A protein has these predicted regions:
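Short aromatic-glycine-(Arg/Gly/Cys) micro-motifs in beta-strand/loop hairpins
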Residues: 116-124
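Glycine-centered tight beta-turn/hairpin loop motif at sheet-sheet or coil-to-beta transitions
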Residues: 106-107, 126-128
């Protein structure tokens, strides 16, 4: 079992303990997508890891912690729609140049930085204030698992 499989399974285990519905794997086709914001269209490192997560669970959610899926029933938690919104005139944030938003919790945003190839948690208001910087998506998911366990020790 890969580290990503372990992380996704553990996140979903906690989610299920909290009473949330676990999302099935994404079975659709992945297309090239232009995220804009100075992000080159080809993102093999991003898509390899994110695609692997989606093929296990098309969206992770537990207690306000979410990693976006593709074409989910909750369009506000759709990876492509959320990133398209960041390109809307008036909503642009120069600090999100080169960053693919992949999720959030109540206080922070999760993104993939295409220039340094890192998976990052930053403050929702101060996007330039990095809280966690990880080599892999699995490591980033593990940071959220630790937070969930810490704040819900009675059920985890």
């Amino acid at each position: 079992m890969t580290l990503l499989e372990i992380a996704v399974n553990e996140f979903n285990r906690i989610s299920k303990l909290m009473g949330y519905v676990i999302n099935p794997p994404y079975t659709g086709k992945l297309l090239k997508y232009d995220f804009g914001r100075g992000i080159p269209p080809e993102q093999p490192v991003f898509w390899q890891q994110y695609h692997d997560m989606l093929r296990m669970s098309n969206r992770l959610f537990a207690d306000g912690h979410v990693f976006y899926g593709l074409k989910s029933d909750n369009e506000s938690h759709d990876l492509l729609n959320f990133n398209q919104t960041l390109n809307t005139p008036g909503l642009e944030n120069q600090l999100m140049t080169g960053k693919i938003a992949i999720g959030h919790n109540n206080l922070d945003i999760f993104y993939y930085d295409v220039f340094i190839e890192r998976w990052v948690t930053c403050d929702r208001i101060g996007v330039d204030r990095i809280i966690e910087s990880c080599n892999t998506l699995a490591e980033l998911i593990e940071t959220q698992i630790a937070m969930l366990k810490s704040s819900n020790s009675d059920i985890c």
